[in-house]
Amino acid sequence: MTNADNELEPRLITETGLDQRLADIIEPVLVGMGFRLIRVRMLNQNGATMQVMAERNDGTMTVQDCEEVSMAISPVLDVEDPIDKEYHLEVSSPGIDRPMVRKSDFVRWQGHLVKCETSIMIGNRKRFRGKIVEADADGFTLERDQVAYGEEQKVIIPFTALSDAKLILTDDLIRDALRADKLAKAQAANQNEADDQE
């Protein structure tokens, strides 16, 4: 999947209510800057806090990127004025134990542990935890690490039933996330070098 495909890929898990209105305001700005929205949440911390999670199309996000995103969306939010009280704007990367919101997240992080929740019962459950062993256009196969008596070890979860999903922090995940970040930075540096030579 290319970066162009990534920026056009819709999120499986989206917000509702005010959070949805905020996402509708913020997402076009992010896409125009080469970023993808992961999640928007209004929290009642330290007064009110708007938490925006984003990443570049290649999956990276630096402190400078967070600052750039904050400076770009702040004036748009001031003009749209969707919140009727003072709030703090907090922009961050999704982190290593990130929310999984797109189909490509399940492909990219195949082999890693995830905990997820579904909107409907699948095999008498709505909550699952296990390793992503396969992902396709319709859903993903989870190999559970905690199987109750009489349950199958593997379960297929359709994307249409998914209501929440998040990676579980493990040593393998940290290693692979650092490796992916290093590779993305090297590719960006090579691209910048090629652009400078033109």
Swiss-Prot record:
It comes from the Bacteria. The keyword Cytoplasm applies. It is found in: Cytoplasm. Keywords: Cytoplasm, Ribosome biogenesis. GO terms for cellular component: cytosol. Pfam families: DUF150_C, RimP_N. Its main location: cytoplasm. One of its GO terms (biological process) is ribosomal small subunit assembly. SUPFAM superfamilies: YhbC-like, C-terminal domain, YhbC-like, N-terminal domain. CDD domains: YlxS_C (cd01734). Belongs to the RimP family. Required for maturation of 30S ribosomal subunits. This is Ribosome maturation factor RimP. It comes from Rhizobium etli (strain ATCC 51251 / DSM 11541 / JCM 21823 / NBRC 15573 / CFN 42). The gene is rimP.
